[in-house]
A protein has these predicted regions:
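Histidine- and acidic-residue-rich, metal-dependent catalytic cores
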Residues: 1-187
Length: 187
């Protein structure tokens, strides 16, 4: 949110929205929420209602901004209109929802589920980078610039078999940090 240029109040509120974005899952039956297999189409239709349920839970909370409430309601909307619950597109999707969406997708990809193994952080970033029709590109870039896949000082194996040490992360090339070859001494 900071990378996107939001002010202190907005950063605070997007944090609240992020914490509350799945509150509507409290209204989804446990047998669906905790199912150890992939959901059926009927079960998924019920699960997709969690964002509406969350909005309804928060609707009467006068101390929460409309941006927080819309972030909860719209966090599964996609820029191309193929999201839910309303199928809205582009700038019709609240900024908070667009911000939450990228983080929510990353979390879903790297988290183990009973029906799937987690993806590596690198694979998750690659998948997110391919979602240019679904996600707000500016929000995606801000998220990717904030993700540190390879902490400085970490040793990694390069594709040529050499071992190298991460010396710098490159903001616009999150998958290609600067490295120092440990045997060659070259950056």
């Amino acid at each position: 949110a900071r990378k996107y240029g939001l002010d202190d109040r907005q950063v605070y509120e997007i944090g609240i929205a992020g914490l509350l974005h799945d509150i509507g899952k409290s209204k989804v039956p446990n047998e669906i929420l905790n199912k150890a297999a992939r959901l059926t189409d009927e079960e998924f239709a019920i699960m997709k209602q969690h964002s509406v349920y969350g909005y309804r839970i928060l609707q009467s909370k006068e101390d929460l901004s409309m941006e927080i409430k819309l972030g909860v309601l719209q966090h599964h909307e996609k820029m191309n209109g193929k999201g839910y619950p309303m199928g809205i597109t582009g700038d019709k999707i609240d900024l908070f929802a667009r911000l939450i969406s990228v983080s929510d997708i990353y979390d879903a990809l790297v988290t183990e589920r009973p029906y799937k193994k987690p993806f590596s952080p690198r694979d998750a970033v690659e998948m997110i980078m391919s979602m240019t029709e679904e996600l707000d590109i500016t929000v995606m870039r801000c998220f990717l610039e904030s993700v540190i896949l390879y902490p400085v000082g970490t040793d990694v194996a390069l594709s040529n078999g050499e071992t190298a040490r991460i010396v710098e992360n490159v903001p616009n090339a999150v998958l290609r940090p600067k490295v120092l070859g440990l045997t060659t001494g070259k950056v």
